[in-house]
Amino acid sequence: MAHLGRLMVPLAALVLLLWAVPGAHGRRNNVRVLTDENWTSLLEGEWMIEFYAPWCPACQNLQPEWESFAEWGEDLEVKVAKVDVTEQTGLSGRFIITALPSIYHCKDGEFRRYVGPRTKKDFINFVSDKEWKNIEPISSWFGPSSVLMTMMSALFQLSVYIRTSHSYFVHDLGIPAWGSYLVFAFATVLSGLLLGLCMIFVADCLCPSKRRKPQQQYAKKTSPEFSQPLKKVEEEQEADEEDVSEEEAEDREGASKATSQSSIRQRCVGLPSATDTS
């Protein structure tokens, strides 16, 4: 029995030691992990999000404070999350992460960047005292859910895909670097041609070109408002034409009279000369 009692003492000490070690007894992790697939859950409720990288020393120093702050999440009615920018490049593009670690506060779809001290106490006061109201929210044009940031996210993901493909071509397939560049150049030209054809097809469907019809002469229909002035103008033109025709007729009559008188005079002058010769 004495020998058994001696064995129980070290065993009990070992159990207590393991229980005292953080995480050894299945400690719950209250920090949620966000990805490109589930990030839309940020648009509902109140959130505190940390953007970090495993290789960042400042991010490593922040982790204990962030996990301690996450334990107060249920009491503060705030959800605490983190994003690994090395794996979730799309999210880093949506938020335009330029420094690590970066912390954002989100309340019902409004995003604000946290710029205060990075301790558990400061995080708690920031949420409980609603200090986030003193910070101007990010414009909807540059919000993570905007069209512009969606395109930025796609651009970040495309850059990672190109880099991964280049590494696969060079290291796994043994293609020279210049050969990989030629592949990407050909793919770029081909995608540009396909995109141009698609745009032309869409434009033709939305705005079809009208076929030109042969021009036909149609009778002009005038409104009653302009019919009376037009009639007056036509009557004046007809009157002017009549005046001109009358003047021309008078001139012709005068000319004919003059010619007849001159011919009579010539005859009268010619008669005595004939008698004299007789």
Swiss-Prot record:
Major enzyme class: isomerase
Keyword annotations: Disulfide bond, Electron transport, Endoplasmic reticulum, Isomerase, Lipoprotein, Membrane, Mitochondrion, Palmitate, Phosphoprotein, Redox-active center, Secreted, Signal, Transmembrane, Transmembrane helix, Transport
Disulfide bond residue pairs: 56-59
A Pfam entry, by short name: Thioredoxin
PTM (free text): Palmitoylated; palmitoylation is required for localization to mitochondria-associated endoplasmic reticulum membrane (MAM).
GO molecular function: enzyme inhibitor activity; protein disulfide isomerase activity; protein-disulfide reductase activity
Residue stretches making up the Thioredoxin domain: 27-132
InterPro entries noted in UniProt: Thioredoxin-like_sf, Thioredoxin_CS, Thioredoxin_domain, TMX_domain-containing
Compartments, record wording: Endoplasmic reticulum membrane; Mitochondrion membrane; Secreted
Enzyme active site: 56, 59
Protein topology in the membrane: Single-pass type I membrane protein
Principal place of residence: endoplasmic reticulum
Signal peptide coordinates: 1-26
Annotated Gene Ontology cellular component terms: endoplasmic reticulum membrane; extracellular region; mitochondria-associated endoplasmic reticulum membrane contact site; mitochondrial membrane
Mutagenesis or variant effect for residue 59 to A: Abolished protein disulfide isomerase activity
Biased composition (Polar residues): 217-226
Region Disordered, annotated ranges: 217-278
CDD domains assigned: PDI_a_TMX
Ranges of the Cytoplasmic topological domain: 203-278
PTM annotation (Phosphoserine): residues: 245, 278
Reaction(s) this enzyme catalyzes, per UniProt: Catalyzes the rearrangement of -S-S- bonds in proteins
Protein name: Thioredoxin-related transmembrane protein 1
Lineage: Eukaryota, Metazoa, Chordata, Craniata, Vertebrata
